């Protein structure tokens, strides 16, 4: 959203993201396993005074580079260790990404202030962007790095100034420090396919100079990454060194089977990622019309290469997660925003509005009419009867004025805010690790050792401000550990809350649909009869 005079409308953007961040902070804790893990890694680095090698539960943590952790530390240095600062990082980055999308729209379509008005609006209200703008993940950060690099590509194309390749290299280097070599998937299609998207534009450079600039930027990016990776590899040991130099490239990009999905999965998920916009048939028609009538347009071609390049490459990789495609959302916002600007809608967005209304009515009906039900329907049935009201209001808001995209955008924001307030907040106690973490901290303060059943994702380290790692052992070995540590305690898990409790627990708390329990050596006998705990989700 930008002022009609072509200036960015900071006030509206800030209010938009402040509302989202405030609702998220008030409605839910940091969620296990990912958010709590990243907080714990930052906490352990802080405790150790080691800002070179990330650590998780006492061991070097090779799954993620350190840039997000450094941003967490920067806030802690200024305001002290807190829970709230890390959770403001993504909203602040999303604000920066909104401005960068506005700036790209102004540069690609300088005569169309309406495109710069609408593209940030589409981005800010798309479901996937909203979800991760309030979550402590790496993907809004890598989206910012991609926007830095792609802004440099556009400026180099329009001005011919070689200095922009230094900025491109900065985007590459920071992207590697944010999430590894995946940044190249977001940057290289547009950089390498410039002869196609610049085919009908004036070029103030030679192609040899262009590709020389791309190579220079890549070398600079590699140098920035190696400035961290080499000393970190030397400090973290051989296993860590091998992991960051090899595991972050071949294994995580090509041989990732943890989230294996079919090649068409992203294409099928796009209407959800870009909800509510891709459920508006008239907008899709406008996009097709714009592509047909302006096929030679530099901006459209650039955004298409950016979006389709990432979509095709990530579709070909076995491991797929929704947030992998987040850096391509600004490209989609540019395409949809320009289509709305060139061919303004005159109809109401019936399909996304009816989807919201149906969701709200269905949730309220389930809460009123369904009894003792298992699974996700049981979760919905346990919500208050008014839990669907916000979705109905959001749908009616979208219909309130024909051909008015801001109403649809505000409906999208309202729907997500209501999801956090009405749905996630009642479920929050089952995802709050602080009570168990506090109990663990009490035992550690007494000098008593603590173990965890199964794979440990460090979910308690930051929440309890723990200063010692936990032993991670499966049930049979954990029983032996309790016998050999008579003053020790262990965290064990029941997969469902209704499961019978075979232990005499010192403390118990709801945990992700089941129960976490703190036991001592009296529970060792019960542990010996247990199957090994299921392995929880791995790294993404």
Q: Where do the language-model regions lie?
A:
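Membrane-embedded architecture of ER/inner-membrane glycosylation machinery
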Residues: 2-3, 166, 170, 284-540
């Amino acid at each position: 959203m930008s002022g009609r005079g072509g200036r960015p409308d900071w006030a509206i953007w800030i209010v938009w993201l402040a509302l989202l961040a405030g609702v998220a902070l008030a409605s839910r804790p940091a969620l296990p396993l990912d958010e709590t893990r990243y907080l714990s890694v930052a906490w352990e680095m802080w405790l150790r005074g080691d800002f070179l090698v990330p650590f998780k539960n006492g061991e070097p943590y090779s799954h993620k580079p350190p840039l997000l952790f450094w941003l967490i530390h920067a806030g802690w240095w200024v305001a002290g260790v807190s829970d709230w600062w890390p959770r403001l990082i993504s909203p602040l980055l999303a604000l920066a990404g909104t401005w960068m999308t506005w700036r790209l729209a102004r540069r690609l379509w300088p005569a169309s202030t309406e495109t710069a008005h609408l593209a940030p609006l589409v981005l800010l209200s798309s479901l996937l962007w909203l979800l991760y703008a309030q979550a402590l993940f790496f993907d809004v950060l890598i989206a910012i790095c991609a926007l830095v690099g792609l802004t440099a590509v556009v400026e180099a194309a329009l001005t011919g100034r070689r200095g922009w390749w230094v900025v491109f290299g900065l985007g590459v280097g920071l992207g590697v420090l944010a999430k590894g070599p995946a940044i190249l998937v977001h940057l290289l299609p547009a950089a390498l396919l410039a002869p196609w998207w610049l085919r009908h534009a004036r070029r103030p450079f030679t192609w040899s100079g262009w590709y020389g600039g791309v190579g220079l930027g890549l070398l600079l990016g590699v140098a920035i990454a190696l400035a961290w990776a080499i000393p970190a590899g030397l400090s973290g040991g051989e296993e860590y060194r091998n992991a960051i130099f090899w595991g972050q490239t071949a294994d995580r990009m090509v041989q990732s089977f943890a989230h294996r999905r079919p090649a068409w999965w992203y294409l099928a998920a796009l209407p959800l990622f870009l909800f509510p916009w891709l459920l508006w048939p008239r907008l899709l028609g406008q996009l097709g019309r714009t592509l047909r009538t302006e096929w030679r347009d530099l901006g459209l071609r650039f955004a298409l290469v950016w979006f389709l390049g990432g979509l095709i490459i990530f579709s070909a990789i076995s491991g797929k997660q929704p947030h992998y495609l987040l850096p391509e959302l600004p490209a989609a916002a540019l395409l949809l925003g320009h289509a709305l600007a060139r061919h303004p809608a005159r109809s109401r967005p019936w399909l996304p509005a009816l989807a919201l209304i149906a969701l709200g009515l269905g949730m309220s009906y389930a809460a009123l009419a369904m009894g003792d039900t298992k699974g996700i329907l049981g979760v919905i049935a346990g919500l208050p009867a008014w839990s669907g009201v916000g979705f109905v209001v959001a749908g009616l808001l979208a219909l309130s004025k024909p051909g008015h995209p801001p109403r649809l955008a505000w409906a999208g924001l309202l729907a997500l805010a209501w999801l956090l307030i009405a749905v996630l907040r009642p479920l929050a106690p089952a995802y709050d690790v602080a009570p168990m973490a506090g109990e663990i901290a009490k035992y550690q303060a007494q000098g008593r050792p603590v173990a965890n059943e199964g794979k440990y994702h460090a979910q308690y380290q930051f929440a309890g401000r723990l200063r010692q790692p936990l032993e991670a052992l499966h049930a049979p070995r954990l029983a032996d550990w309790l016998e050999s540590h008579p003053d020790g305690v262990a965290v064990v898990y029941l997969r469902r809350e209704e499961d019978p409790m075979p232990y005499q627990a010192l403390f118990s708390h709801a945990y992700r649909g089941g129960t976490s329990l703190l036991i001592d050596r009296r529970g060792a006998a019960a542990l010996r009869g247990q199957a090994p705990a299921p392995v929880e989700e791995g790294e993404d």
